[in-house]
């Protein structure tokens, strides 16, 4: 970093980082992780679009969350390709290795928007589960509208938040890579990281409560199906109860993973920003390249979504088979009553 309008030459310590084979290997490893995550994101989105085993709004939230991942990973790929290009073709020009922060704004904004977007979409999923639990019969009938409205609102919140983080920052400093956070915006970014951690913790607590409520509702429906084998047994209500429970379990599981991702990202970023001044450029570069958590989260989240969808599908098949058995038992019971009446 440097003062405005003054081009910066890389220091000998900076050149040590660029010439390090370990650092170069770490950059290619980052690219491998990023391209792998993009492949998994595409697979997960395709699975969400083709398998309607969870409600439409939940699928929409998951897709928007994956798009936030892809936004981050696209910017991350551009960032890593820039550094690799510097290493391969510009090491003989040490005074042309730094970037003006303004020229990096789209990459930096995309990295931040991808991270914060995943947090805001987590809020949308939590709100959706609350309303689904409160309005058990009404909410599923709204189909995709809750997803459209809540996703649009959270995207707006995310855009506003990113603008606030970089508010009044002229972006005139020079940075060694486009992943380097502009110094005038670091304070607001760290403040948001603290808020994001509390948000994720609140999501976890709320989802635990919702999961408990859905378990109670499902047990009540089971009790009805066990003691009422007549035509008054509402198969649709029983099925909706099971779907709500399994969807809540799935969202709870995904929220757990996202909470862990947010927690690790927050802790890592705060530690990194605190310790970075005492690190050499090589130590700082290797630490960021190997332990930055978001690329790993963007591999884990689509993988968990695909595993969870498979789990829900299998559970739904079991629930349908169980309900069919219960319906047949009820029909047999009514046939017995009819035979007795005809005698």
UniProtKB/Swiss-Prot annotation:
Residues 46-60, 128-146, 214-247, 313-343 are cytoplasmic. It is found in: Membrane. Pfam families: 7TM_GPCR_Sra. The keyword Membrane applies. Keywords: Membrane, Olfaction, Receptor, Sensory transduction, Transmembrane, Transmembrane helix. The keyword Transmembrane applies. Residues 1-24, 82-106, 168-192, 269-291 are extracellular. The chain crosses the membrane at residues 25-45, 61-81, 107-127, 147-167, 193-213, 248-268, 292-312. It is a multi-pass membrane protein. InterPro entries: 7TM_GPCR_serpentine_rcpt_Sra (IPR000344), Nematode_rcpt-like_serp_alpha (IPR051080). One of its GO terms (biological process) is olfactory learning. One of its GO terms (molecular function) is olfactory receptor activity. Its main location: membrane. GO terms for cellular component: membrane. A G protein-coupled receptor required for olfactory imprinting a requisite in ordorant response such as benzaldehyde and isoamylalcohol. Belongs to the nematode receptor-like protein sra family. This is Serpentine receptor class alpha-11.
């Amino acid at each position: 970093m440097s003062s405005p309008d003054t081009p910066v030459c890389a220091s000998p310590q900076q050149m040590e980082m660029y010439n390090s084979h370990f650092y170069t290997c770490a950059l290619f490893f980052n690219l491998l992780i990023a391209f792998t995550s993009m492949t998994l994101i595409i697979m997960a989105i395709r699975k969400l679009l083709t398998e309607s085993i969870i409600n439409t709004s939940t699928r929409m939230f998951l897709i928007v969350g994956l798009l936030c991942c892809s936004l981050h990973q696209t910017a991350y790929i551009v960032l890593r390709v820039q550094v690799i290009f510097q290493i391969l073709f510009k090491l003989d020009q040490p005074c042309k290795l730094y970037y003006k922060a303004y020229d990096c704004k789209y990459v930096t904004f995309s990295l931040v928007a991808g991270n914060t977007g995943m947090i805001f979409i987590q809020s949308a999923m939590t709100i959706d589960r609350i309303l689904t639990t409160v309005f058990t019969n009404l909410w599923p009938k709204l189909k995709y509208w809750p997803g459209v409205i809540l996703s649009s609102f959270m995207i707006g919140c995310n855009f506003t938040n990113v603008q606030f983080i970089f508010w009044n920052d002229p972006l005139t400093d020079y940075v060694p890579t486009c992943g380097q956070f502009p110094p005038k915006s670091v304070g607001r970014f760290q403040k948001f990281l603290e808020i994001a951690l509390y948000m994720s913790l609140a999501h976890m607590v709320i989802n635990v409560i919702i999961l408990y409520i859905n378990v109670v509702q499902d047990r009540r429906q089971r009790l009805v199906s066990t003691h009422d084998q007549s035509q008054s047994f509402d198969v649709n209500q029983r099925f909706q109860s099971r779907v709500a429970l399994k969807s809540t379990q799935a969202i709870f599981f995904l929220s757990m993973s996202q909470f862990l991702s947010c927690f690790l990202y927050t802790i890592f970023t705060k530690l990194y920003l605190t310790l970075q001044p005492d690190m050499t450029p090589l130590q700082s570069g290797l630490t960021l390249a190997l332990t930055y958590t978001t690329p790993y989260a963007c591999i884990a989240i689509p993988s968990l979504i695909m595993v969870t969808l498979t789990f829900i599908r299998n559970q739904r098949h079991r629930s349908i088979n169980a309900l069919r058995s219960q319906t047949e038992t009820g029909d047999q019971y009514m046939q017995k009553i009819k035979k007795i009446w005809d005698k």
